[in-house]
């Protein structure tokens, strides 16, 4: 009897582990390109660190960070591509994609640095549950290409400097397609629906600024070498279903 009970408990324990194993077996995306000499790494939810190379898996919960002269592109399973500049960091908070499903979702958080992303099929699926956090605001994405810059909270000479962010809507890859982002926080929200325009959140207690024409030279300069790869290279454009 005791032997049977032990076997049952062992089988139950194995069954409980199966979902975790299944999740680990299917990464959210992979590293499509890395440039620069310093390291790029991922911190998993259990705190473990691993060096990133072209082809490395990116999993839900990973915090991806770059060194002082490193840039990279992450290609996700739904066709989304994220380009990250030097000394930058973002977290894959949630990723769930299955072709034809209505509950697809993709949530990320940019912690610091510069970025550019091209949304994929999650942003075009029925639920359109794609959200990008930039510390001081959240971007609701509706099939688009965006660049931005995030400054993390810091302390200088004993004075706290709030986090801040700037985001700009870019021309969509598919000509003639409607594109927009909703930028919101607890103090207000704006809709940016014209390429070349954007908004700024100057601190942690302010609403997004009025939409205006913007160009982030810092982002353009840093990611210039990656721009062609985001649009072409080894990262194919996502196709509409």
Model-found features: residue ranges?
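C-terminal interaction modules
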Residues: 1-27, 49-53, 77, 85, ...
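Short N-terminal segments immediately surrounding and downstream of signal-peptide cleavage
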Residues: 25-43
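Residue-level recognition of beta-strand termini and adjacent short loop/turns
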Residues: 36, 77-78
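Generic short beta-strand segments
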Residues: 36-39, 69-72, 144-146
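A generic structural motif
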Residues: 41-43, 75, 184
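N-terminal post-signal-peptidase region of extra-cytosolic proteins
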Residues: 44-61, 65-71
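Short, small-residue-rich packing micro-motifs
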Residues: 64, 68-73, 81-132, 137, ...
């Amino acid at each position: 009897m005791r032997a049977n009970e032990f076997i049952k408990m062992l089988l139950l324990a194995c069954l409980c582990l199966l979902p975790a194993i299944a999740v680990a077996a299917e990464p959210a995306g992979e590293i499509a390109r890395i440039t620069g000499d310093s390291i790029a790494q991922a911190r998993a939810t259990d705190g473990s660190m691993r060096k990133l190379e072209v082809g490395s898996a990116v999993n839900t919960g990973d915090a991806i960070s770059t060194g002082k002269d490193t840039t990279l592109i992450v290609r996700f399973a739904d066709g989304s591509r994220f380009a990250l500049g030097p000394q930058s960091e973002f977290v894959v908070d949630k990723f769930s994609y299955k072709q034809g499903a209505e509950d697809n979702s993709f949530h990320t958080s940019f912690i610091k640095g510069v970025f550019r992303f091209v949304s994929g099929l999650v942003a075009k699926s029925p639920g359109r549950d794609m959200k990008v956090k930039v510390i001081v605001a959240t971007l609701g994405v509706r099939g688009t290409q965006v660049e931005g810059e995030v400054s993390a909270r810091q302390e200088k000479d004993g004075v706290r400097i709030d986090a801040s962010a700037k985001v700009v809507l870019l021309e969509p890859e598919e000509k003639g397609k409607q594109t927009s982002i909703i930028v919101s926080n607890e103090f207000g929200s704006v809709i940016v629906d014209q390429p070349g325009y954007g908004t700024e959140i100057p601190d942690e207690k302010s609403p997004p600024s009025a939409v205006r024409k913007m160009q982030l030279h810092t982002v353009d300069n840093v990611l210039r070498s990656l721009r062609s790869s985001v649009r072409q290279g080894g990262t194919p454009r996502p196709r509409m279903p």
